């Protein structure tokens, strides 16, 4: 059975151990968290503070992890954008909000979401609309439009893009659409 104190799950609170023990404990906590899922520097900092690790130990551990490339918010942000855009169809706005929520700084967020082109974003939104249209055939047009607009809004797409794509895809199905675009009021 592994020693729980050695891996940072139990043991004395942060302030009562020797600095070397605190460093080893913080390192073990970070490594355990990182084996489950990638984390940002801010997420690791929060986790260590909850375990009463002193700030100077946190900085030392995370600086070292940054030097060797174990913790890199820019790499995390790029991977997050690629994964969440491909998997969930999230738009740049929603992706940026998720990254900010995870403690990624604004410049890194901007760089990561700028890697997603407007053409990619539109193509993904169009795929989402087509998939949802197929699932809502037979329902009244108003219901379909409302569901499509809500889905795109929840994923962070602008109202202008959403209206345009919904209109184009419904017209491609031969459905007469008569709803104002956001620009028309």
UniProtKB/Swiss-Prot annotation:
GO terms for cellular component: cytoplasm. It is found in: Cytoplasm. It comes from the Bacteria. Pfam families: RecX_HTH1 (PF21982), RecX_HTH2 (PF02631), RecX_HTH3 (PF21981). Keywords: Cytoplasm. InterPro entries: RecX_HTH_1st, RecX_HTH_2nd, RecX_HTH_3rd, Regulatory_RecX, WH-like_DNA-bd_sf. Belongs to the RecX family. HAMAP family: RecX (MF_01114). Modulates RecA activity. This is Regulatory protein RecX. The gene is recX.
């Amino acid at each position: 059975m592994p020693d729980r104190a050695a891996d940072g799950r139990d043991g004395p609170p942060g302030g009562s151990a020797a600095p070397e023990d605190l460093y080893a404990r913080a390192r073990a906590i970070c490594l355990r968290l990182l084996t489950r899922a990638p984390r940002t520097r801010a997420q690791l900092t929060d986790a260590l503070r909850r375990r009463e690790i002193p700030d100077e130990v946190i900085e030392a551990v995370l600086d070292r992890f940054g030097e060797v490339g174990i913790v890199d918010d820019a790499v995390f942000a790029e991977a997050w954008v690629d994964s969440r855009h491909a998997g969930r169809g999230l738009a740049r706005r929603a992706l940026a909000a998720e990254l900010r929520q995870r403690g990624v700084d604004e410049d890194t967020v901007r760089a990561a979401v700028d890697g997603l082109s407007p053409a990619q974003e539109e193509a993904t939104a169009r795929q989402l609309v087509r998939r949802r249209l197929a699932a809502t055939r037979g329902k009244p047009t108003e219901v379909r439009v409302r569901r499509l607009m809500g889905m795109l809004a929840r994923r962070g797409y602008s109202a202008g893009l959403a209206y345009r794509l919904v209109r184009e895809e419904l017209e491609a199905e031969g459905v007469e659409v008569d709803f104002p675009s956001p620009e028309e009021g």
